[in-house]
Every structure is written in C-alpha cells, then in structure tokens.
Amino acid sequence: MEGGGDGTTAREHAEVLLGLGFVAAQAYVLGAWTDVNRIRQSSARAPVTKSDCYASDTITVQAGITRIHVINATANYFKHHDEWRTWPQNETARILATIDITQKTEFPCIDATELLCGTGWRLIVLHRIVKEWREHLIHSLQ
C-alpha cells in the first residue's frame, strides 16, 4: 500500500468513514420519525415513539431487531464509544450484541456494514434501506 500502510491501517480509516455513514443514515431516520409525527399531529393522531418506528422495518436481522435498530445502534456506538470507560449496559450495546458486536469487536462499524451492505462496503445500500423504510413508515403509520 502507498505510504507503508497495511490492511489494519486501511480498516482503521474505513471504520471512521463507515461510522460517519451510519450517523448520516441515523439523521435520515430521525427526520423520517419527525415527519411521520408531524403528519400524525396534523390529523390529531397520537405521536409514534422512535422505538415503534424502528420496529416497523419489515426486515429483521435477528428476532425483534430490524435493520433500522442496527443503523441507529451503530451510529450511537460511533458517536459515543470514545466516551465509554467501560462497555455500557444500554439499548445500544444490547442491540449490537445481538449481531455479535461487543467490546471485543475490533471494527464494529465495518462488521455492521458487512451485515447490512455486504463485504463490498457499499454505503449506498444504507441509503436504500432507510429510503425504503421511510416510504413504508409514512404509508403504514401516518
């Protein structure tokens, strides 16, 4: 590799870029949740929780865990893992554990990307996932 890099160095750099991709997908998901609740409010319907929205994805990766749960948890991991002195006992860690991402996982964002997008790390797949989910969300929960 140019500059004396090795495979580990390349994966370290990819981990950051993929983590940013998950944060961007999370922002899209949060925007969809806000949109559906605005639509519901305009027709005097009760708001929907984020948890219910994430669970509405039609594709699960494990029992009760959807692709949207994984996107959200991976984004939260990426944003906050440097603050963690120890691995947390929270919803993010619980969801990641269901897809075998733990404190021992060297590259969590890479592992999550491979699960959702394949080994080619094509982040456009994340966009497709959240776009299709948003369309389903608007039609099913508005």
Residue ranges and their predicted role:
Residues L30-R45, H80, W84-P88:
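Short, solvent-exposed secondary-structure capping/transition elements
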Residues M1-G19, V48-Q142:
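Acidic, Ser/Thr/Gly/Pro-rich intrinsically disordered interaction regions
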Residues A10-R40:
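Short, well-structured hydrophobic secondary-structure segments
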